Amino acid sequence: MTAEQLPPELQRVHMVGIGGAGMSGIARILLDRGGLVSGSDAKESRGVHALRARGALIRIGHDASALDLLPGGVTSVITTHAAIPKTNPELVEASRRGIPVMLRPLVLAKLMDGRTTVMVTGTHGKTTTTSMVIVALQHCGRDPSFAVGGELGEAGTNAHHGSGDYFVAEADESDGSLLEYTPHVAVVTNIEADHLDFYGSTEAYVGVFDAFVERLAPGGALVVCADDPGSAALAERSAELGIRVLRYGSAGHAEAALAATLVSWEQRGTGAVAQIQLAGEADPRSMRLSVPGRHMALNALGALLAAIEVGAPVGEVLDGLAGFEGVRRRFELVGTAESVRVFDDYAHHPTEVRATLEAVRSVVRQSGSGRLLVVFQPHLYSRTKAFAAEFGSALDAADEVFVLDVYAAREQPLTGISGASVAEHVTVPVRYLRDFSAVAEVVAAAAGPGDVVVTMGAGDVTLLGPEIVAALRMRADRSEPGRPGVLQ
């Protein structure tokens, strides 16, 4: 691929915050299409290292001179307004030089131009469902381009420039940026109040999904989960506008006709087997999954319909879904030590927490008499304030809970809001741990043979999984001198 296949403004770019999940994916695609890319980020990361290996010139720290990393200068600067302040010295310098500054969603829309696009949005399950569509199409030999918010287990990457005619991407609803896109197939997994710090009201948040659906390309289709009240209502409103709607959901749950029905579902270890019925077919089909949880089976149904809609054969799609190994930080096994399994999960909304813990509970139940221990880090003060009681209720699915302090991300602290706000609503044994550095030792000391530990949240709680495994290993070494701890 050559830079001539990119729009002129994307042939030589500088990316502020290049190491982030969304930005690093854009950088990968630009590099794969022959573009020249420089960038900056606050710290080193796996994403930064991978992009350097592909040829990106990256500086740690933010300084106006970073715009000169590429010999000959840049044609544009790319950033994401959710995380990068306008006072950033590189953005200030770009403005002084008259260099256009583009936001990530607009750049992604430009990269999609000319391809059949499948976009997945919703309050929960976006990344997993998007990844399922990608894996299914790859299995069918379609080699789609893609950009997703997590790292695919199979591909080991969050973005790819494919040779096929398709582009599959996650549409982030958190800041309204999904309105930059014009998809051919739009999948909406669910709609539930979130990101009220940006939208101000539930009505405004729900409204952005209606606006997104109205941007469907002519002849496009909306795929929605009819089990979810929010997306089911969106389906009704969209159908009234003449938009073609394909619904999926559970048998006996939805009021409207379903294009794909989850007839039954059975947990098997860390996977599942489901019976599904497709509209127009006489007999049900079997759908095998390698990831646990009924919510995953519903996500797979949405991915199946999206893949079928762009011409993929049903049987091949189901085979592809059977091999889907999950997404990094979505119930990802970190390691096992002393018969304790440690997982990491990105859940950061009460509904996500509840769905994940229900799935984990079924895994624990099948494996014996072990307990479920959850290390939960609330994400954002505004979300913690809005959903403290709901988080507490969701965490009650565990046997023991360790609540950390709030991961602030882009927000300033709110008076009276902390991890304790969540902990006080948990009714099972709970500990509020303010000292992040001590968490691994405390959790390892509490875990026993057969237990499952899940670190959960969208912040740096993900760093604790390896530390807990290491602490368990150290405990084994201390208890039996000369015997190495088990680490897988």
From Swiss-Prot:
EC numbers, comma separated: 6.3.2.8
GO BP, one annotated term: cell division
Subcellular location field: Cytoplasm
Pathway(s) annotated for this protein in UniProt: Cell wall biogenesis; peptidoglycan biosynthesis
Keyword S-adenosyl-L-methionine: no
Keywords: ATP-binding, Cell cycle, Cell division, Cell shape, Cell wall biogenesis/degradation, Cytoplasm, Ligase, Nucleotide-binding, Peptidoglycan synthesis
GO CC annotation, single: cytoplasm
Residues that, per the record, bind ATP: 122-128
Lineage: superkingdom: Bacteria
Pfam families linked to this entry: Mur_ligase (PF01225), Mur_ligase_C (PF02875), Mur_ligase_M (PF08245)
Family as reported in the entry's similarity comment: Belongs to the MurCDEF family.
Name of the protein described by the UniProt record: UDP-N-acetylmuramate--L-alanine ligase
Organism, as annotated: Mycobacterium marinum (strain ATCC BAA-535 / M)
